[in-house]
C-alpha cells in the first residue's frame, strides 16, 4: 500500500475515493523510562527512551491506518497527517494520531 503526505501520487491516477481514515495509538511511559529521560534532560541531549516510544507509536498508527484503508478497498492513502500529543496529569502518556484519505490508484 502506498502511503504519502502529498495529495496525489506522481505517476498514479486516483480513480476512487474511499473516505477518510484515521488511527490513534496511546502509549504509557513508565517510571523507569521517565527517570532515564529526566537524567538525559538534566545533562542535555536527546532522550532515546522517548524517541523510541514515539517511533513505535507512529509505526503502529500508520500500520493501523493502512489496515483500515485496506478494509475499505483502498490501495493507497494520500494526504497523511501525523500529530503527537502528551497526555495524562504528569505527561505519562504519548498519543500519535494519523489521518488521511483512502483511495484507489492505477
UniProtKB/Swiss-Prot annotation:
Q: Which Pfam families match?
A: YbjQ_1
Which cysteines form disulfides?
Answer: none
> What's the protein name?
UPF0145 protein Csac_0771
Q: What is the superkingdom listed in this entry's lineage? A: Bacteria
As for family, the record states: Belongs to the UPF0145 family.
Give the source species.
Caldicellulosiruptor saccharolyticus (strain ATCC 43494 / DSM 8903 / Tp8T 6331)
Matching InterPro entries: UPF0145_dom_sf, UPF0145_YbjQ-like
SUPFAM superfamilies according to UniProt: YbjQ-like (SSF117782)
Amino acid at each position: 500500500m502506498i502511503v504519502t503526505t502529498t495529495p496525489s501520487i506522481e505517476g498514479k491516477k486516483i480513480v476512487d475515493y474511499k473516505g477518510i481514515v484515521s488511527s490513534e495509538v496511546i502509549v504509557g511511559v513508565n517510571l523507569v523510562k521517565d527517570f532515564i529521560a529526566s537524567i538525559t534532560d538534566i545533562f542535555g541531549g536527546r532522550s532515546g527512551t522517548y524517541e523510541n516510544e514515539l517511533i513505535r507509536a507512529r509505526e503502529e498508527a500508520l500500520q493501523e491506518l493502512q489496515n483500515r484503508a485496506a478494509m475499505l478497498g483502498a490501495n493507497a492513502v494520500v494526504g497523511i497527517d501525523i500529530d503527537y500529543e502528551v497526555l495524562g496529569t504528569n505527561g505519562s502518556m504519548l498519543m500519535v494520531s494519523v489521518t488521511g484519505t483512502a483511495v484507489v490508484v492505477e
